């Protein structure tokens, strides 16, 4: 999603007057206005006598009253990173500014739809197939979007691009998580997030170099076609955990054998213990022969639905409230754009470092509770004390809110992937990620209303953040625990009871250190 703010950034603009028409301005009078008052004509003349700029797509405060259209071309005073974008290509300003907001909404809806609808194929046909299919289609879709000749074509192809990129993100996340043992899951998940943050910085650098939005679109999407070489046998392996759950034992043995041979020291043969473990794999996995479930049967697992509801709501709020923490004084200048871009990426990287240091020590649930608490505190301070704080204090709490909301979003996604069983992990995690993408709609929705109601929206989101704090305490702890494989395992992942000791087979009752057996 890092490309959308650059592709839809409204540049500073003014009307190119040229030879002024008889009404002494570069603005066209609406056909319904047969006569303009003397005051209106004087205001139009004064507007023509100076260079007026605006970054508001509705041209509010820019156009003279009762004048809607510029007779000449628009002059765009340049973007921070590109010479022009789709807004300047088709003059999507003033009365056409709604198309820019519609493109932003469709792009986010593309991500939400991809997360939601590609989770089932990932569970049914495998993670590898979904990743290869969507990666292969990203390139043609992106190149086609760069060659589009109208804003309608751009919006359609951007929706499809978001749909496909969501499939790539979901499939790769599942494969990373299912490949690791319990002690490495957090590190691998955070490494993937840091790679994404690095991609944001790389995209900003490519935008500075390319200058043309069409060339930039081709540059970032066309190389995805090369990822089709991942389909070469033995190069990009299917998730062995998913193969075992689907009872494809021979394929799982083949994948595990390849991984074991790659990880063994150079020049050594595969050990006998590894060979015996691979041969006995079928006997040690007493799973049902089928892993297809009806929707009615899924409704019986109330604990799984409770975890999905809490984590989905938390992820939604963490993404929705993020735009409320923009630094004070963002006026649309190049320096403000760079500040917002670097601040968003920098706080995401800082959140990854914070989670890597604290989560394995204090647990997923505790750090998620702390992150949402900091998010709520930052919102309450900004809402209640905005008029009494200086710019430095406002910026400090805005950065705190950005940091904590980033950490909450990352950790809620990881925790959801760890409590959802393998049989439905694609669908469950896709639902969580789709809710997070829908939370991103709060920013274009606010722009659609010209910023009206921003305070009320922040109040509602802050109240929901406080509600998340209460609900997070109902979640189980998944630190150093095995991933649940079937629905029965996911149903046993519960929060430890506060009043009585849970039985030993509960998912939450796993000792941190193994106790010696006195009988031995």
Curated annotation (Swiss-Prot):
GO cellular component: organelle membrane; plasma membrane; vacuolar membrane
Domain of life from the UniProt record: Eukaryota
Keyword Ion transport in record: yes
Residues modified by glycosylation: 23, 32
UniProt keyword Ion transport, yes or no: yes
Membrane topology: Multi-pass membrane protein
GO MF entries: transmembrane signaling receptor activity; transmembrane transporter activity
Location(s), subcellular: Cell membrane; Vacuole membrane
Residue intervals passing through the bilayer: 100-120, 129-149, 154-174, 189-209, 219-239, 303-322, 337-357, 366-386, 397-417, 428-448, 455-475
Key words, A-Z: Cell membrane, Glycoprotein, Ion transport, Iron, Iron transport, Membrane, Receptor, Transmembrane, Transmembrane helix, Transport, Vacuole
InterPro entries: MFS_dom (IPR020846), MFS_sugar_transport-like (IPR005828), MFS_trans_sf (IPR036259), Sugar_transporter_CS (IPR005829)
Record-linked SUPFAM superfamilies: MFS general substrate transporter (SSF103473)
Main location, first listed in the record: membrane
An example Gene Ontology biological process: siderophore transport
Gene3D superfamilies: MFS general substrate transporter like domains
Protein task: Cell surface receptor for LCN2 (24p3) that plays a key role in iron homeostasis and transport. Able to bind iron-bound LCN2 (holo-24p3), followed by internalization of holo-24p3 and release of iron, thereby increasing intracellular iron concentration and leading to inhibition of apoptosis. Also binds iron-free LCN2 (apo-24p3), followed by internalization of apo-24p3 and its association with an intracellular siderophore, leading to iron chelation and iron transfer to the extracellular medium, thereby reducing intracellular iron concentration and resulting in apoptosis.
Listed PANTHER family: SOLUTE CARRIER FAMILY 22 MEMBER
Protein family per UniProt: Belongs to the major facilitator (TC 2.A.1) superfamily. Organic cation transporter (TC 2.A.1.19) family.
Name by which UniProt lists this protein: Solute carrier family 22 member 17
């Amino acid at each position: 999603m890092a490309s959308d703010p650059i592709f839809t950034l409204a540049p500073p603009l003014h009307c190119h007057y040229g030879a002024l028409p008889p009404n002494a301005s570069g603005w066209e009078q609406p056909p319904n206005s047969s006569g303009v008052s003397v005051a209106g004509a004087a205001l139009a003349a004064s507007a023509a006598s100076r260079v007026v700029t605006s970054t508001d797509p509705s041209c509010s405060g820019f156009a003279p009253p009762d004048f809607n259209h510029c007779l000449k071309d628009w002059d765009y005073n340049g973007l921070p990173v590109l010479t022009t974008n789709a807004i300047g290509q088709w003059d999507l300003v003033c009365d056409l500014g709604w198309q820019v907001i519609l493109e932003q909404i469709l792009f986010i809806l593309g991500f939400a739809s991809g997360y939601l609808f590609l989770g089932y194929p990932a569970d049914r046909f495998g993670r590898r197939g979904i990743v290869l299919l969507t990666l292969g289609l990203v390139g043609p879709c992106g190149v086609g979007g760069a060659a589009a000749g109208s804003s309608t074509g751009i919006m359609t192809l951007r929706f499809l691009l978001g749909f496909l990129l969501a499939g790539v993100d979901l499939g790769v996340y599942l494969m990373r998580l299912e490949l690791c043992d319990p002690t490495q899951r957090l590190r691998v998940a955070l490494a993937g997030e840091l790679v994404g943050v690095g991609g944001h910085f790389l995209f900003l650098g490519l935008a500075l170099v390319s200058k043309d939005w069409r060339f930039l679109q081709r540059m970032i999407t066309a190389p995805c076609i090369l990822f089709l070489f991942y389909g070469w046998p033995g190069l990009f392996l299917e998730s062995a955990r998913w193969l075992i759950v689907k009872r494809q034992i021979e394929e799982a043995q083949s994948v595990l054998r390849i991984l074991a041979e790659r990880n063994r020291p150079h020049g050594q043969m595969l050990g006998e213990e590894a060979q015996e473990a691979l041969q006995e794999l079928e006997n040690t996995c007493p799973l049902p022969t089928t892993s297809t479930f009806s929707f009615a049967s899924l409704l019986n697992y109330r604990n799984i639905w409770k975890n999905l509801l809490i984590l989905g709501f938390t992820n939604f709020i963490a993404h929705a409230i993020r735009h409320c923490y923009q630094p004070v004084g963002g006026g649309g200048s190049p320096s403000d754009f760079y500040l917002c871009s670097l601040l968003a990426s920098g706080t995401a990287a800082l959140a990854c470092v914070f989670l890597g240091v604290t989560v394995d020590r204090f647990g997923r649930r505790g750090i998620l509770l702390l992150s949402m608490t900091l998010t709520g505190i930052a919102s309450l301070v900004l809402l209640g004390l905005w008029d009494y704080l200086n710019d430095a204090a406002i910026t400090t709490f805005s950065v705190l809110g950005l940091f904590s909301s980033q950490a909450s979003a990352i950790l809620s996604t990881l925790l959801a992937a760890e409590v959802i069983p393998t049989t439905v992990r694609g669908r469950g995690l896709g639902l969580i990620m789709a809710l997070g993408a829908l939370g991103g709609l709060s920013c274009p929705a606010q722009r659609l209303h010209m910023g009206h109601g921003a305070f009320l929206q922040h109040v509602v989101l802050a109240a929901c953040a406080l509600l998340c704090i209460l609900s997070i305490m109902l979640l189980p702890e998944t630190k150093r625990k095995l991933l649940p494989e079937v629905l029965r395992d996911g149903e046993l992942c519960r929060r430890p009871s506060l009043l009585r000791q849970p039985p030993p087979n509960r998912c939450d009752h796993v000792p941190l250190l193994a106790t010696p057996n006195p009988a031995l």
